[in-house]
């Protein structure tokens, strides 16, 4: 960790979505996103949907150019990881100031999305797909 980062206030948040887990740090800066040591644009393949999803909690509070986002994320795909980062950033902003909680909660940035892959059941081909039925 740089000596510059040690002197600044660091706010932590953890986010989860599907099988992705993101540990997010907010550091006072100019709005850069760094995910697993790579730039956010590069890591997310320049996908504007994922980038806007990550920036959404900061935009809700009008802080998009005030904090750098440093992320360690693992598991799942890019969409799950982007939503996990979004939730982690929102939780870190709540740590920054308790007043931030209400606007973030009304926008839905703090709630965990419970949807996950349904398990396969025995006797079926997939989670709900049954083998073809033959009457005779």
From Swiss-Prot:
Pfam families: Ribosomal_S9. GO terms for biological process: translation. Residues 97-136 are annotated as: Disordered. GO terms for molecular function: RNA binding; structural constituent of ribosome. GO terms for cellular component: cytosolic small ribosomal subunit. Residues 98-116 have a biased composition (Basic and acidic residues). Residues 117-136 have a biased composition (Basic residues). This is Small ribosomal subunit protein uS9. It comes from Prochlorococcus marinus (strain MIT 9312).
């Amino acid at each position: 960790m740089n000596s510059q980062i040690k002197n600044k206030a660091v706010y932590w948040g953890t986010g989860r979505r599907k099988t992705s887990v993101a540990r997010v740090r907010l550091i006072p800066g100019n709005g850069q996103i760094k995910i697993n040591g790579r730039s956010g644009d590069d890591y997310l393949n320049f996908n504007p949907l994922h980038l806007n999803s990550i920036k959404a909690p900061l935009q809700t509070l009008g802080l998009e150019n005030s904090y750098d986002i440093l992320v360690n994320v693992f598991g799942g795909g890019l969409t799950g990881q982007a939503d996990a980062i979004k939730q982690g950033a929102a939780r870190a902003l709540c740590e920054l100031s308790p007043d931030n909680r209400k606007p973030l909660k009304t926008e839905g940035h703090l709630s965990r999305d419970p949807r996950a892959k349904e398990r396969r059941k025995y006797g079926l081909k997939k989670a709900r797909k049954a083998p073809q039925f033959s009457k005779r």
